[in-house]
Amino acid sequence: MAFTQKTIIRNVSPMDVVRCFHSHKFIEFLTLGQPVKIESWKGIDNNKEASFSFWFFGWRKMSVVHENYILNREYLSFEDKGLILPFGLQGWTHRHIVKPYESGALIIDQIHLEE
């Protein structure tokens, strides 16, 4: 199963968005008010891992490793590959892309699940 979401951020440079992706405080901000616990987060560079728990009729654990990190002046791309997955999932790949768009930035999330 595949899912793609695109988010346009106006009047913000792509590099400002990229800096946010590298900030642990930004990750905490994204999960604020959600039933999510960040267990560990090492960063988004290649081979760095992240693990967290989220509430869905009980706490569920998920762990990923980051791969295929690409960064240049106005572009970022990296993937989360599932290590520990909930709900019997066999595979999880989440590709993050940040690139210029009109007077701002475009964030593209491409998620592929294997059941």
Put a short name on every predicted segment:
Residues 1-48:
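Hydrophobic ligand-binding cavity/cleft-lining segments
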Residues 1-6, 75, 91-93, 106-108:
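Intrinsic-disorder/low-complexity, polar/charged segments enriched in Ser/Thr/Lys/Arg/Asp/Glu/Gln
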Residues 5-7, 62-70, 93-100, 111:
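Hydrophobic/aromatic beta-strand elements that line small-molecule binding cavities or substrate pockets
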Residues 8-13, 55-57, 99, 112-114:
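Solvent-exposed residues in well-ordered beta-strands and their adjoining turns
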Residues 11-15, 43, 68-75, 97-108:
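A short, structured loop/turn motif at beta-sheet edges
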Residues 25-29, 38-86:
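Glycine-rich portal/gate segments that line the openings of hydrophobic small-molecule binding cavities
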Residues 34, 62, 103:
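Residue-level signal for beta-strand positions within conserved beta-sheet cores that form or flank
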Residues 82-115:
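Beta-strand/loop substructures that line and gate deep hydrophobic ligand-binding cavities in soluble
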